[in-house]
Amino acid sequence: NPPLVLFSLDKKSTSLQLYKKANHIGINILSNKQKDLSEYFANNKPEWGNVKYFLTNNDIPMIKNSVVNIDCEKIKMINQGDHLIFICKVNKIKIDKNKKPLIYLNSKYIL
């Protein structure tokens, strides 16, 4: 029973093809001090130019100063309506318990 995590992407996402091709995926839970970074990735084609990150052993970029960084291996994709669901096995997880997560709820940030 390896730990699993899942997420979904809209089939219109500019990043969809990258995730479909990837065997290893990085998942980052941003801190409440990273609102600008969240908006950057939400509104632009994701490019890592000025984003501070580190690489995992699998060469997956992880965003520095996040609350959680999860290094995953993709094990399954499921078509569901206008989204594609990714199920991933967690290989390694890094948690900073001193930080609070960034939460987006009902079309606004909760800081």
Residue ranges and their predicted role:
Residues N1-L111:
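Basic, polyanion-binding surface patches
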